[in-house]
């Protein structure tokens, strides 16, 4: 179910503060976060945010097409290694 339009999009306070500080100083540096539930807002465009995937932080460059999506959508947590092989030779 989509979030109500009466509410603002969720962005973690610590993440929003870091982005605002970097925008005021006009600096670009990698921002490390565990907040996968935060929504990407227009002030984040042009920054690189390292999003935690459960094991490591994946650096993601934020573009204008990502606005409105969640950070977690761009850092996959599962790696598919293929289905189990049906190896008939090893059964004999």
Curated annotation (Swiss-Prot):
InterPro entries: Ribosomal_uS19, Ribosomal_uS19_bac-type, Ribosomal_uS19_CS, Ribosomal_uS19_SF. GO terms for cellular component: chloroplast; mitochondrial small ribosomal subunit. It is found in: Plastid, Chloroplast. It comes from the Eukaryota. GO terms for biological process: ribosomal small subunit assembly; translation. Keywords: Chloroplast, Plastid, Ribonucleoprotein, Ribosomal protein, RNA-binding, rRNA-binding. GO terms for molecular function: rRNA binding; structural constituent of ribosome. It holds the Pfam family Ribosomal_S19. Protein S19 forms a complex with S13 that binds strongly to the 16S ribosomal RNA. Belongs to the universal ribosomal protein uS19 family. NCBIfam families: rpsS_bact (TIGR01050). This is Small ribosomal subunit protein uS19c. The lineage of its organism: Eukaryota, Viridiplantae, Streptophyta, Embryophyta, Tracheophyta. The gene is rps19.
